[in-house]
């Protein structure tokens, strides 16, 4: 079981690394966010692998801290991804800046915890468990988990909103990412008190990372291709207008421009 679990995490790390590399070679802000997101997720996977397989209180404590830090920044990247992917969160600059400021402070406190143990202490390591005792009276212990869960709930609500308000061409992609995030969140909640090294939420979040890459930069609905080809073949002499998944006009041919006297199309 221990070997199989480690092999699963290692495979996910490799796949996320491949996703990051492929996203790096694509253009656009969304591709850049996906590249950074996949890279940080792959790094988090490596740290988690070291956490469960390399013995030693100090190195295990450091890797636990780094894993928690990675989750802070992954959530920020996921919010930016959601912004560019769905068009939401454009008007919440102050909130995003506050999230970055909190994550920076939280990162410093978690690194310092390796020596001062003010947030958590690892008391025992064996083949099946890493016993972690959190200082539940510490502000940053409470703030870290409240912050993480609130952001995940916000992201889930945002994807629910997009599923309800998008065409069937795009809602399928939102649904897949929503389901993966929801499963990871539920597994995280269910196992929050578990000291087992077999954290079932980690593979779920890893799968979500790969789904994000695929449905953002690779997936094109067959129905969209068929309908687009049909439109071009049958209605070449008609006015054509195309919208993206946010409902914004991304293309308008000359015939439609002349019909409506359009001189500028915002892309």
Model-flagged regions — what are they?
Residues 18-26, 83-87, 159-167, 215-219:
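Structural signal for the C-terminal ends of transmembrane alpha-helices
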Residues 260-261:
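PAS-family sensory domains
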Residues 2, 161-231:
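Interfacial "cap-and-anchor" motif at the non-cytosolic start of specific transmembrane alpha-helices
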Residues 1-13, 28-114, 145-149, 199-206:
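Individual alpha-helical transmembrane segments in multi-pass integral membrane proteins
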Residues 23-47, 95-101, 136-193:
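Alpha-helical transmembrane segments of multi-pass integral membrane proteins
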Residues 1-11, 110-158, 189-201:
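Extracellular-loop-to-transmembrane junctions of the mid-late helices
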Residues 265-267:
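Conserved small/polar residues in nucleotide/adenosyl-binding loops
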Residues 222-256:
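Sensory modules in modular signal-transduction proteins
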């Amino acid at each position: 079981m221990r070997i199989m679990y480690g092999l699963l995490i290692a495979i996910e790390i490799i796949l996320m690394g491949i996703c990051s590399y492929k996203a790096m070679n694509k253009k656009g802000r969304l591709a850049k966010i996906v590249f950074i997101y996949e890279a940080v997720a792959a790094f988090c996977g490596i740290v988690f692998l070291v956490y469960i397989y390399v013995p030693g209180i100090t190195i295990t404590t450091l890797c636990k801290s780094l894993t928690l830090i990675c989750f802070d920044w992954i959530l920020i990247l996921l919010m930016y991804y959601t912004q560019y992917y769905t068009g939401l969160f454009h008007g919440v600059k102050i909130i995003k800046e506050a999230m970055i400021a909190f994550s920076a402070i939280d990162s410093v406190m978690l690194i310092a915890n390796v020596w001062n143990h003010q947030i958590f202490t690892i008391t025992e390591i064996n083949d099946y468990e890493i016993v972690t005792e959190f200082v539940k009276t510490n502000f940053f212990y409470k703030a870290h988990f409240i912050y993480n869960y609130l952001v995940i709930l916000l992201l889930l609500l945002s994807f629910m909103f997009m599923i309800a308000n998008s065409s069937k061409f795009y809602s399928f992609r939102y649904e897949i990412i929503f389901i993966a995030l929801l499963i990871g969140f539920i597994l995280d909640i269910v196992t929050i008190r578990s000291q087992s090294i077999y954290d079932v939420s980690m593979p779920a979040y890893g799968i979500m990372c790969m789904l994000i890459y695929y449905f953002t930069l690779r997936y094109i609905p067959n129905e969209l291709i068929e309908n687009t080809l049909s439109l071009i073949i049958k209605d070449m002499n008609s006015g054509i207008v195309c919208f993206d998944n946010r409902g914004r006009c991304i293309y308008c041919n000359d015939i439609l421009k002349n019909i409506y006297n359009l001189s500028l199309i915002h892309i």
